[in-house]
C-alpha cells in the first residue's frame, strides 16, 4: 500500500490534519508493506517528526513494514540532521548549524533520559530568552510535566516521541512531544463523569489548575506556566488529542475539530527567540505545586 503526503507539513492545524489523515487511512492494515510517498512534500517542519514518528511506530506495531520513499533532497537533509531517517534506512548527517533537537522515542520508564534530553538539547540553548534561575527551574519542570502527563494519564505502551527545531531566520524554536495513549478526552470525561468533546476536554485541561491527577500532590501548573510564558514571549502553544485541536497565541485561545483523530496527545511549544526581555517569577511557587 502507498500513501502520499502533501506539499507542506508544518506545525499547524493543516499539518496535523495531513498526518492524522495518513493514520486514518492506514491504521487498519496488518502484515502489509506500507510506503509513505514524499515526492510532493517540499517542506517538513522537523519538530513534526514527533507526530509522524508516533504514527509510523503505531503502524509498525500492527506488524506492517513501513518505508519512506521518494524523499526530496531538502526534506531528506532536514530529517537526517535530527536522526529521524536513521530509523528508516538512512544515515544521519552532521547538524553543523546546531539547529536540530534530535528525534527520540522514550519508554514510559525513561524519565531520567527525557530529563537529560530536554536539559542538553532544549533548555541550555543560548537562543532561549533570558530567565531567572527560579523561572528556568519552573520552565524545565513544566516541560517535564508534559512527559509526566503522558506517563500518568495516557496508559501508552508504545512510548513517547519528541523532536524540535531552531528556525533562525524566523526567530523561533519549536519543541513537540507526542504520545500514543488514550487521549485527553477520555481522561477528562471519566474524571468529570460526563461525556465531553475532545475540544472541550483540552480547554478544560488548560484552564487554571484543572487536572485529572489525584492524590495529595496536585498537578496541572505546567501548561498554565507555559501558557503564561508564551503570552509574554509572543510564542505559541498547541495541543492535539483525539479529534480536538487547540492553539494559544497572541494571548488568545482557539480550538477546532480535526477531521481525523490523533491516537494520543501532542503538545507543541513555540518560543520567540527574538524576544530580548528577561523573565523572572512573579510569585514564589513551591516546587511541589507541580509534581
Language-model region placement:
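Conserved ATP-binding N-box helix of the HATPase_c
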Residues: 53-55, 131-168, 224-230
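Conserved phosphate/pyrophosphate-binding and hydrolysis machinery centered on Walker-type P-loop NTPases
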Residues: 9, 42-45, 132-140, 219
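Short amphipathic
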Residues: 1-7, 97-107
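Helix-loop-beta hinge of the Bergerat
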Residues: 101-132, 185, 192-208, 228
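Amphipathic alpha-helical interaction surfaces in cytosolic regulatory modules
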Residues: 5-88
